[in-house]
């Protein structure tokens, strides 16, 4: 291991003890588990520095949004006693190793077993960032952020902060309209400007990119939008949110098990820390809880040969009793981290047996929690989406395939997709946007056209709550785009009940047709 690999710093000084531990954990991850990851520099920081790091990670430009995020994060940490264990920041170029080095922030108020568990957790994130096909091409280079900030300040001097923020706000809006799934669409894209009615010549899913190429704007406006697009390309990594947190928690538990072999007390504390975070009784912790347990289940199934066509055709009881000594669990887990998005992860590997185990464990934990607090189940948890999700599976016996999509939408791993349909832009009629609801086709079974329409209407109604974008944020976004391009903007979508609706922004008002 190189002399500058995996340094742990507190201020300007290297913490020798934690640096040695970080290197020992890295060696365990690489040699025992087979992980591969880039170099990292761990920085022990206080809550104020952590809040600043969180704010500038998402918005490295010196904007109102960065300041707002900092104030919110700092208030939560300092006044509400909320604590963030770690944050993996952007990478920078490491000249010594001729490769990438990630900057990782760890809360220095953490206890020793927490810091060591967090370092193990971070190595899981770094493995995903290096190897997963979604993450590898959608990370932001920290080394250019300072140059972007200087240029942003210069533009404020040239045209005024209000003008710059107006375009920045538009950029934030368009950042939600990048193509989250570019690898799934292989049509060759047009690269030339056109005002014909067949522009674009195909369905265009990267609305941000299309606006940059086809809308007339001032050079400084284009420069700001290009800055924002570059920075917000990291949004695509939401496609692996469950896998990211699940795999990091998975290897964190592996390290806790290793520690337990020689130090039971510390190993137990590490397990308690992990399962306090990967808690299925908390809406916000679902990516950790579900991802961890699904990775563990996959490892067990591939260790015991419980997979494949022959196994899947066995009766339920025979599947439970089936077991071979295959020992390919970790190999399979690593293969998934490289080749899958959350969509593949959930739809391919979350089978009925796992759903039964997961819901049983969650309900057992719930009963313990309720006995301790002496409250009625529905009284405390009826508004939690995870509780409704579990009840739909156990009480209502909802199709697991529907519940999988809901899980993906609730954890941001599948966001509503908006695109420009073929011929949806010209200088007379404006810009037409359409919500892509093709994801619902998997729940329509009939081949008869009339019946398919009826079934699709029913499916839209069932998923309307998760997929509708008819809210104040959408109205404001459409108005912002319309004012910038000086043309009407129409969005074809569904309302809260699943009915087709078109929202129009004409530069003065926003209304539904």
Model-derived regions, located:
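Auxiliary, metal-adjacent structural segments of Zn-dependent hydrolase domains
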Residues: 2-8, 12-102, 135-139, 192-212, ...
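Glycine- and acidic
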Residues: 6-11, 100-108, 228-240, 273-280
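Short pre-active-site segment immediately N-terminal to the catalytic Zn-binding motif
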Residues: 79-86, 101-119, 235-243
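Non-catalytic terminal regions of proteins
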Residues: 102, 109, 113, 264-513
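Active-site metal-coordination segments of metallo-dependent hydrolases
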Residues: 110, 138-142, 197-200, 233-247, ...
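Internal metal/ion-chelating core segments
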Residues: 171-246, 251
């Amino acid at each position: 291991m190189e002399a500058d690999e995996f340094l742990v710093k507190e201020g300007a000084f290297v913490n020798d003890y934690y640096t040695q531990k970080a290197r020992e954990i890295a060696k365990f991850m690489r040699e025992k588990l087979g992980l591969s990851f880039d170099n990292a520099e761990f920085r022990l920081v206080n809550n104020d520095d952590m809040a600043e790091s969180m704010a500038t990670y998402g918005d490295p430009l010196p904007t109102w949004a960065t300041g707002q995020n900092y104030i919110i994060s700092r208030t939560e940490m300092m006044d509400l006693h909320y604590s963030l264990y770690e944050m993996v920041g952007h990478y920078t170029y490491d000249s010594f190793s001729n490769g990438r080095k990630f900057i990782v922030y760890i809360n220095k108020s953490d206890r020793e077993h927490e810091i060591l568990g967090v370092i193990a957790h971070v190595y899981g994130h770094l493995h995903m960032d290096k190897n997963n096909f979604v993450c590898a091409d959608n990370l932001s280079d920290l080394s250019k952020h300072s140059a972007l900030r200087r240029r942003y300040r210069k533009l404020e001097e040239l045209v005024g902060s209000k003008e710059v923020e107006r375009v920045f706000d538009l950029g934030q809006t368009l950042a939600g309209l990048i193509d989250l799934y570019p690898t799934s669409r292989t049509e060759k894209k047009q690269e030339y400007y056109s005002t014909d009615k067949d522009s674009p010549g195909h369905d265009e899913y990267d609305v941000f990119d299309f606006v940059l190429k086809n809308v007339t704007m001032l050079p400084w406006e284009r420069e700001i939008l290009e800055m924002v697009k570059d920075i917000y390309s990291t949004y695509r990594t939401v496609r692996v949110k469950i896998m990211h947190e699940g795999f990091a928690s998975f290897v964190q538990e592996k390290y806790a098990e290793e520690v337990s072999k020689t130090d039971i007390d510390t190993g137990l504390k590490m397990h308690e820390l992990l399962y306090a975070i990967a808690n299925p009784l908390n809406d916000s912790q679902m990516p950790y809880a579900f991802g961890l347990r699904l990775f563990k289940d996959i490892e067990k199934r591939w260790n015991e040969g419980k997979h494949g066509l022959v196994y899947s055709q066995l009766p339920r009881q025979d599947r439970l009793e089936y077991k071979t000594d295959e020992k390919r669990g970790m190999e399979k887990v690593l293969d998934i981290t490289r080749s899958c998005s959350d969509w593949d992860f959930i739809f391919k590997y979350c089978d009925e047996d796992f759903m039964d185990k997961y819901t049983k464990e969650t309900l057992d934990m719930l009963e313990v929690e309720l006995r301790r607090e002496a409250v009625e189940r529905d009284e405390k948890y009826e508004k939690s989406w995870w509780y409704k999700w579990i009840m739909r599976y156990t009480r209502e016996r909802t199709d697991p395939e529907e519940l999988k999509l809901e899980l993906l939408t609730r954890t941001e791993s599948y966001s509503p997709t908006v695109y420009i349909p073929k011929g949806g832009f010209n200088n007379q009629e404006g810009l037409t946007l359409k919500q892509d609801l093709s994801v619902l086709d998997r729940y329509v079974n009939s081949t008869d056209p009339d019946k398919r329409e009826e079934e699709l209407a029913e499916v839209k109604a069932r998923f309307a709550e998760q997929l509708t974008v008819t809210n104040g944020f959408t109205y404001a976004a459409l108005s912002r785009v319309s004012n910038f391009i000086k043309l009407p903007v129409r969005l074809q979508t569904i309302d809260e009940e699943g009915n087709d609706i078109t929202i129009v922004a004409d530069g003065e008002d926003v209304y539904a047709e």
